């Protein structure tokens, strides 16, 4: 029995917020701010966006390790945040997130048509998220009401390790019956999500304008001048540079051209691990 390189993609494994739903990834960001505020600790939207893509407990732990935020916490409680304190913030974050997730549940404009086209081309649609299952269940329900149903969903607490570890992406490979990780493309708007795909041995596509890095609504994105948009693209490309995505595109609507190019490269014998 011999190993043969895959010659075309079999699956796209997609993030959720900032990738398929919630243009600008506002749902988790705003709730982090509100959860910390309930402990009288101020966290800005920009600070809250920093670790986006990680599991939510890890996200809060990372925020609490930021020296400026740790100092604000110390001024209120007389100590820097422990893991128990992180859990307390997380336990407040969760019901707030579930309560308000519907506010930011709209599909990214054009995403449904794009994904329909990918399926017509034979791709399976896997998915994973930094949300835990209790939140993902609500996100999935709301997306279905808007016409989007992924073939598989993996929440951050359904594997031993969340992003940037590869476990969630690999769980999709197993569930979808994919025979080679190189026949998968991971699409995400965050650095941890791209690292997840890289570590899983997949092709990776970073979304520059629809997610956390740009942090604008669809209307705000559309209103950017050509000069400002190009400046923001350059800034965000630099943010992703260390995670080495194979492709960077504005939104998921640019994905079909990337899929075609990956299939061309696979047919030539190229593999994602080599680039």
From Swiss-Prot:
Gene Ontology biological process: DNA repair; organic phosphonate catabolic process
Molecular-function GO terms, alphabetical: magnesium ion binding; phosphoglycolate phosphatase activity; phosphonoacetaldehyde hydrolase activity
Matching CDD domains: HAD_PHN
Residues that bind Mg(2+): 15, 17, 189
Textual note on the cofactor: Binds 1 Mg(2+) ion per subunit.
GO cellular component: cytosol
Entry's EC annotation: 3.11.1.1
Catalytic activity field: phosphonoacetaldehyde + H2O = acetaldehyde + phosphate + H(+)
Keyword terms: Hydrolase, Magnesium, Metal-binding, Schiff base
Cofactor(s) listed: Mg(2+)
Active site: 15, 56
InterPro entries for the chain: HAD-like_hydrolase_sf, HAD-like_sf, HAD-SF_hydro_IA, HAD_sf, PGP-like_dom2, Phosphonoacetald_hydro
Highest taxon in the source lineage: Bacteria
Family to which the UniProt record says this protein belongs: Belongs to the HAD-like hydrolase superfamily. PhnX family.
Oligomeric and partner information: Homodimer.
Function: Involved in phosphonate degradation.
HAMAP family assigned to the protein according to its UniProt record, in alphabetical order: PhnX (MF_01375)
Name of this chain's protein: Phosphonoacetaldehyde hydrolase
